[in-house]
């Protein structure tokens, strides 16, 4: 993690697995290096790990991100959606075990946000890893979350946790707009309202 744990344990990989787990983060402000080109930003995690075949892996990632032909541009010359895709690609190129995302789509308009939510699902099919996604958008949580954790007011605590019955990891299936999607969205909205009102929620897993 970025900060040392105050209490508790976090397990990543089985006890038989060797090596330190690799974690990556996509920040809310993306934290792209403005003095590096698109290709330079993608290559940096691999250079820090002293990986081989960096140029080829960067080319492959550029194709996945639909950024081919832009590899020599700097982040300031990209559109908002292109910068978002670059940040995701830089995080995934090192093949992390866990990818943390801190509201990466919050500054985007609704249409672009939905496009990138779908794009993230496509990336996850090709780069399977555990993803922890922080959001204040209920619809985004219902669309992306296999499990959803609701945090209470400060000091933060887990107010509720459960499996999302509406979740599918198939990027070709868009559940948004279905009755089942709206049903889960309403339940989550009611849970958020209850927590804000100071009501206690029972921790569940799937209920």
Predicted feature residues:
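Conserved ABC transporter NBD signature motif
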Residues: 5-20
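Hydrophobic anchor residue at the start of the ABC signature
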Residues: 26, 88
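Signature (C-motif/LSGGQ) region and adjacent switch/coupling loops
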Residues: 39, 71-74
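Short helical segment in ABC ATPase nucleotide-binding domains corresponding to the A-loop/adjacent helical element
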Residues: 39-47, 55
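Conserved ABC ATPase "signature" region
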Residues: 52-70, 122
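Conserved signature/switch motifs of ABC ATPase nucleotide-binding domains
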Residues: 73-76, 94
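Catalytic Walker B motif of ABC-type/P-loop ATPase nucleotide-binding domains
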Residues: 99-102
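Helical segment within the ABC ATPase nucleotide-binding domain
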Residues: 113-127
């Amino acid at each position: 993690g970025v900060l040392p744990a105050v209490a508790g344990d976090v397990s990543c990989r089985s006890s038989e697995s060797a090596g330190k787990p690799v974690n990556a983060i996509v920040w809310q402000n993306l934290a792209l290096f403005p003095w590096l080109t698109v290709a330079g930003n993608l290559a940096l995690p691999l250079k820090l790990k002293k990986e081989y075949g960096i140029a080829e892996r960067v080319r492959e990632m550029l194709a996945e991100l639909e950024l081919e032909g832009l590899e020599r541009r700097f982040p300031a010359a990209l559109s908002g959606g292109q910068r978002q895709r670059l940040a995701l690609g830089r995080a995934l190129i090192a093949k992390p075990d866990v990818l943390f995302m801190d509201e990466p789509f919050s500054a985007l308009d609704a249409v672009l946000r939905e496009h990138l939510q779908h794009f993230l699902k496509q990336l996850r099919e090709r780069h399977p890893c555990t993803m922890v996604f922080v959001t204040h958008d209920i619809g985004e949580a219902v669309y992306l979350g296999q499990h959803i954790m609701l945090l209470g007011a400060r000091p933060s605590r887990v107010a509720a946790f459960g499996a999302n019955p509406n979740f599918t990891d198939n990027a070709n299936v868009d559940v948004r707009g279905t009755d089942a999607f709206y049903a889960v969205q309403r339940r989550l909205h009611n849970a958020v309202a209850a927590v804000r009102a100071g009501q206690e929620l029972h921790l569940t897993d799937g209920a």
